[in-house]
C-alpha cells in the first residue's frame, strides 16, 4: 500500500518506518527541509532503540522515502497520516494550528480518493475540523474528490516504540464508513499474528480514548507517589506496599513505582488538554486536576528533603544527578523532573554533577542551556543522587552500595 506520513518527528518517523518494514511504500513529509536532508543522508534526528537501523534498511530497500513536497508524496497515496505536533497553548489546551495547516495543504494538493488519518493526539471533535478544512479547499478547486477522516491514536512508549508498533496491544480505529474500516484493517493486518486486536468505534470515541489512556496512566503514577509520601510519614515501606497492591490482578504492577513524577511529551500536555476539554464543555475535572497538582509537587519533593537536611543555602554542596531524561532508554527531556530539581538546587547555590547515557546533549543544547554550576560527567560512578524510579530497584540499590563502597576507598 502507498502511504504518506506528514510529520517526521517521533510518532511520524516511527510509524512510517514500521509501515515500511511491512512492505508498504511510505513517504515521510516534513516542512523542515534541513531535517529531510539529514534523513536522506541517513542522519536520524531522534534517539529510539533500533530506529536508525530500521530506517536505513528500509531506505535501502526503497520502501521508505523522505521529502518536503506534499504534492509529490500524495500522488499515489491511498492513506495519509497526520503526525504533527499539538503543542500546549498558553491556557493548557492543545494547539491545532499545525494539524489544520496540514489539512489545508492536503485539500490543496490531493489528487485521488484519500483516507486522512489523525495520528496526532487531538481534542475530541478535531476530525470534524480537519474534514471541514479539507472540504473547503476542495471546493475552492471545484473538485469533487472523495476523502474520509479517520482517528487512529498512537500508544507508543518512548524507549520501546518499535516493539509497541510492531506488536501492538490494540489498534484503535475511529471511522464513519465500512470502506475506511476495511482499508485501515488491511494496512494493520500484517502486524497481527495470532488474533484480532482491532478496536473499532466512532471517531469522537477514538479521539477521547487516547486522552483517557494517558490520564489513567498518569493517575496511577500520582497515586503511587501520594502513597509513597504517606508511607514515609507513617513509617511504612512504599516498595513493600507497591508489591502488596500490585499483586492484585485488578491493579497490576505497571505504573505504580514511586519516583519524581511523570514527564515527557505526552502526559503533562495531555492532562492539561483533557482538563481544558472538560472545562470547555462545562465540566470541572477534579480528579484530573488533582493528578496534575500531585505531580507538580512531586517534582520538588527531593529538593524539599535536601533543604530539610542541609538548609536553604546550598552553597558549597555538590549534588550528583543520575538521569536527565524523563525516563530510561530515551534522550527526551521534555518536562523531565530532573530539569526542575537541578534548577531549584542551582538557584540555592549548589553545584551539580550530571550524568545520563543518552540525554546530555539535549541538556546542554536545550533544556539546561545557560544554567550555571553544572558539570556533565561521563561516568555514572561520578554521581550518587538518583532521580529515576528504576534506580530504586534491587539492581539500583546494589549499584549505589557499590558506589558508596568504592567512594570509601578513594
What are these regions (language model features)?
Residues 1-410:
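Structural/interface elements that position substrates and couple domains in central-metabolism enzymes
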